[in-house]
Each structure stands twice: as C-alpha cells, then as structure tokens.
Amino acid sequence: MSVLWRISNHSDLSGEGGRRGSARWHTRGRPIVYLADSPASAMLEIVHLQDGNGKLPSFYHLLEIRAPEDLPIKDLLTMADAGWKQKLELTQRIGNAWLASLATPLARVPSAIVPRTWNYLLNPEHPDAGHVKIESVVRERFDDRLFRFGPR
C-alpha cells in the first residue's frame, strides 16, 4: 500500500472542494482531491490557504490515505518542464484533461512550493477511486512557529 497525506477539515475524498474553486491543476466545477507524499509536504502546500487576515485555523485534520501499490498513477508533468509554475492555465488544462479522460485514479505532479517534491491528485470519479481510502484522521493544533515570519 502507498501512503499519501492530506490536511483538511473534511474527512472525505469526494473532491467537493474542487467543485467550488479552481486551483493549480483544475478549474472550478470538477471534483478533485489534492494529496501529498508526506505530512510535512501536505503542511507546506496549505500555506496559501490562509484566511483573509493571513492566519490559519487553530486546528487541522491530518488524513492518512492508503492506495494499493498496483493502482495506476499517471505523471502529468515532469520537474524538467521549464516555466510551468508561471503557467497556471497550462497546468489547469493538463489537469482538466486528465480528469475528463478517466485514464487513472491518481496522477503525480510536481510541487510548486517544495522543490524536487511530488504531489498527487485523486480523481474521485474514476471507477477505481474507491480503492483509495482514508486510513486514519488525527486532529492537531498548528504550531504557532510554523508560519511566523519576520523578527521574533
């Protein structure tokens, strides 16, 4: 089993958040679940999700997610593809095409935040998406030091 991670206040893999808003690898209206290969990567990927005051909520849920080793994963983009971080429309087009194709339940994409790190996308509409399951959910408090910048 492969282990993937997600930080969310919703303990499901429905992809409903993707229906409500666009992100790096999809446009609004499409169910999708963003996953990371470690809890630390999942934490760093949510930096941009601060509230309007630049703050994160006090608590979060860390989801440990299991996928069978033999579940197909498609690489959507290599880290060598130059300039992709600045081409949001390109990455959204690639992600939307993958979602529509139902080619694989999981896709691997490079992190735009952490160099040489991979993230994963789950297409909840793929027939084999049900094999990807939440193993555990732990409620944790954000460490105040984590996102504090500037003088101490």
Range-by-range predicted roles:
Residues M1-G18, H26-T27, K55-R152:
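Active-site and NAD+-binding cores of ADP-ribose-processing enzymes
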Residues T27-L49, Y120-E125:
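Extended catalytic/binding region for NAD+/ADP-ribose chemistry, centered on the ART fold
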Residues H48-L56:
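Short helix-loop boundary/capping segments at the starts of domains
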